[in-house]
């Protein structure tokens, strides 16, 4: 997740006294407004709990009123502080930090704690209505959905809630996975748009975990609905013969066999992103990026209209970063949710091991850069858990030992999706046009691009990074 404090506001408290509010943005969207004193209080709590050596530097208190230049300097320092805390594996996942952000989000949006009904969507478009509190965090809502569907406790960790934006043409854009520091009801309500919805989707990448999910009736139905949906939207490539086999299995109600066949298809389990821009293999190339199978897959359109395909393995990414910058927009095109006439430009850049001794930066300019980063991080996390002999099931067992999950008695069946539509003939043409990228002959990132706007820098080292030999290339 990308934290930034791009702006400040002078506001008045209940006594009429003015103060400076620092607007904390997550992924380019306002999450909360906080005062310096609130962040100082958080810092003191963290310092008391974890010690001075662990906690990053915090901007000192000033005796006199700050000048505008000093306010801006403090804004930058607080931004770096929030980014440092969030990126620390201990501090960033601490309940102290996350509860502070949840409370600040609720106070900023001025939403009182009360019982409400929240709609969660399944991949097949089915709505699940859950009764929650406005102050319920993401995990609480996920558990409420699982309870409504009668999904067993041990399978809850295989799924996550995602914020998506529906398009007029029926497609959807995955904005982000909902995090532990936010309140889902507040997050979606604060967007003030019916285009956004929360979707339940599997949260893992390794297809071996499918077997655990398919052993349960509800888990099988959820995975089946997601697979059908991914095929319908063209995320999974299917030729005519494969489509005929899938349709036959669907008509027989053979859901497990349907999924088993789908697992053999290209891009099964991938998340596809909206068309965006990359500097690889050439600057300004249009690209469609997919995340799955521990890689980022590129479908690149070169300046000569030629289509090429290539993949970047997460184990060869030494590190990556997300940067944000404010970009002025023309009159009438500014984002209505923003008070300033600026859009946030997001970039994901990763340093990739192209050959044994050659690292190269590759940059993607996309409003979904954060979601791409989340995908990379979850792939790395999954690889590290597997490397240490762990699994999702073992993690859930530990969680249940620490505290049992509460469930209601209400249940709701997961409906089967409709029969597959006929395959889009244009999808096969894309496969025929694409050829493999040659990493040896392609140019990399220019120095001007790699510098970027580091004021909103979100840097990630990769613990799953592996060296390679020439025989791997």
Curated annotation (Swiss-Prot):
For the biological process aspect of GO, one term held by this record is: intracellular protein transport
Gene3D superfamilies this protein is in? Answer: 1.20.80.60, Phosphatidylinositol 3-kinase Catalytic Subunit, Chain A, domain 1, Phox-like domain, Pleckstrin-homology domain (PH domain)/Phosphotyrosine-binding domain (PTB)
Coiled coil spans: none
User: Which Pfam families does the entry link to?
Assistant: PX (PF00787), SNX17-27-31_F1_FERM (PF21273), SNX17-31_F2_FERM (PF21271), SNX17_FERM_C (PF18116)
Show the SUPFAM superfamilies listed in the entry: PX domain
Per the record, membrane topology reads: Peripheral membrane protein
Principal subcellular localization: cytoplasm
Q: Where is this region: FERM-like?
A: 114-433
Stretches for region PTB-like F3 module: 269-433
What are the annotated GO cellular component locations?
cytoplasmic vesicle; cytoplasmic vesicle membrane; cytosol; early endosome
Which CDD domains does the UniProt entry name for this protein? FERM-like_C_SNX17, FERM_F1_SNX17, PX_SNX17_31
Ras-associating domain: residues covered: 114-205
Give the region (Disordered) as residue ranges.
391-431
Q: Does the keyword Membrane apply?
A: yes
State a single Gene Ontology molecular function.
phosphatidylinositol binding
Biased composition of type Polar residues is found at: 403-414
The UniProt keyword set, sorted, is:
Cytoplasm, Cytoplasmic vesicle, Endosome, Lipid-binding, Membrane, Protein transport, Transport
* Boundaries of every PX domain copy: 1-108
Instruction: List localization entries.
Output: Cytoplasm; Early endosome; Cytoplasmic vesicle membrane
Q: Where does a 1,2-diacyl-sn-glycero-3-phospho-(1D-myo-inositol-3-phosphate) bind?
A: 35, 37, 61, 74
**InterPro entries referenced in this protein's UniProt entry, alphabetically:** PH-like_dom_sf (IPR011993), PX_dom (IPR001683), PX_dom_sf (IPR036871), RA_dom (IPR000159), SNX17-31_FERM_F1 (IPR048763), SNX17-31_FERM_F2 (IPR048767), SNX17/31_FERM (IPR040842), SNX17_FERM-like_dom (IPR037836)
As for family, the record states:
Belongs to the sorting nexin family.
Give the function comment from the record: Critical regulator of endosomal recycling of numerous surface proteins, including integrins, signaling receptor and channels. Binds to NPxY sequences in the cytoplasmic tails of target cargos. Associates with retriever and CCC complexes to prevent lysosomal degradation and promote cell surface recycling of numerous cargos such as integrins ITGB1, ITGB5 and their associated alpha subunits. Also required for maintenance of normal cell surface levels of APP and LRP1. Interacts with membranes containing phosphatidylinositol 3-phosphate (PtdIns(3P)).
Oligomeric state and interaction partners are given as: Monomer. Interacts with CCDC22, CCDC93, DSCR3 and VPS35L; the interaction with DSCR3 is direct and associates SNX17 with the retriever and CCC complexes.
Domain remarks:
The PX domain mediates specific binding to phosphatidylinositol 3-phosphate (PtdIns(P3)). Required for association with endosomes.
The name on file for this protein is: Sorting nexin-17
From which source organism is this entry? Danio rerio
Task: Give the taxonomic lineage as stored in the record.
Answer: Eukaryota, Metazoa, Chordata, Craniata, Vertebrata
């Amino acid at each position: 997740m990308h934290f930034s404090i791009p702006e400040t506001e002078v506001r008045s408290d209940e006594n009429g006294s003015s103060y400076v509010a620092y607007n904390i943005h997550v992924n380019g969207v306002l999450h909360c407004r906080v005062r310096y004193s609130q962040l100082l209080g958080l810092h003191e709590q963290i310092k008391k709990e974890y010690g001075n050596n662990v906690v990053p530097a915090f901007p000192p208190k000033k005796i006199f009123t700050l000048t505008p230049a000093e306010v801006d300097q403090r804004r930058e320092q607080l931004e770096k502080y929030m980014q440092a805390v969030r990126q620390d594996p201990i501090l960033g996942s601490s309940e102290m930090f996350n509860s502070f952000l949840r409370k600040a989000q609720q106070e900023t949006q001025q939403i009182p704690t009360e019982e409400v009904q929240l709609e969660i969507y399944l991949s097949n478009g089915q709505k699940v209505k859950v009764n929650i509190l406005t102050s319920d965090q993401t995990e609480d809502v996920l558990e409420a959905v699982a309870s409504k569907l009668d999904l067993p406790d041990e399978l809850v960790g295989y799924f996550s809630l995602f914020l998506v934006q529906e398009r007029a043409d029926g497609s959807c854009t995955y904005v982000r996975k909902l995090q532990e520091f936010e309140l889902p009801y507040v997050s979606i309500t604060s967007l003030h748009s019916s285009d956004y919805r929360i979707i339940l989707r599997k949260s893992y990448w390794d297809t071996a975990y499918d077997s655990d999910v398919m052993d349960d009736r509800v888990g099988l139905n959820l995975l089946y609905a997601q697979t059908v949906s991914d095929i319908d939207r063209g995320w999974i490539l299917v030729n005519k013969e494969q489509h005929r086999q899938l349709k036959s299995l669907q008509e027989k109600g053979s859901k497990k066999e349907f999924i088993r066949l789908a697992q053999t298809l290209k891009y099964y389990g991938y998340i596809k992103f909206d068309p965006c821009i990359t500097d690889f293999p050439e600057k300004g190339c249009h690209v469609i990026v997919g995340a799955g199978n521990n890689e980022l897959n590129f479908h690149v359109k070169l300046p000569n209209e030629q289509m090429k395909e290539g993949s970047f393995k997460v184990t060869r990414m030494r590190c990556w970063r997300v940067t944000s910058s404010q970009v002025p927009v023309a009159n009438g095109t500014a984002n209505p949710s923003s008070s300033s006439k600026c859009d946030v430009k997001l970039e994901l850049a990763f340093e990739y091991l192209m050959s044994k001794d050659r690292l190269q930066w590759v940059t993607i300019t996309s409003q979904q850069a954060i979601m791409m980063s989340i995908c990379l991080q979850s792939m790395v996390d999954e690889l590290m858990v597997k490397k240490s002999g762990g699994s999702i099931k073992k993690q859930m067992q530990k969680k249940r030992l620490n505290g049992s999950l509460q469930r209601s008695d209400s249940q709701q069946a997961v409906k089967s999706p409709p029969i597959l539509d006929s395959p889009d003939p244009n999808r096969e043409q894309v496969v025929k046009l694409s050829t493999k990228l040659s990493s040896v002959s392609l140019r990399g990132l220019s120095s001007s691009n790699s510098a970027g706007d580091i004021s909103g820098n979100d840097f990630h080292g990769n613990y799953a990074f592996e060296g390679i030999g020439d025989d791997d290339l």
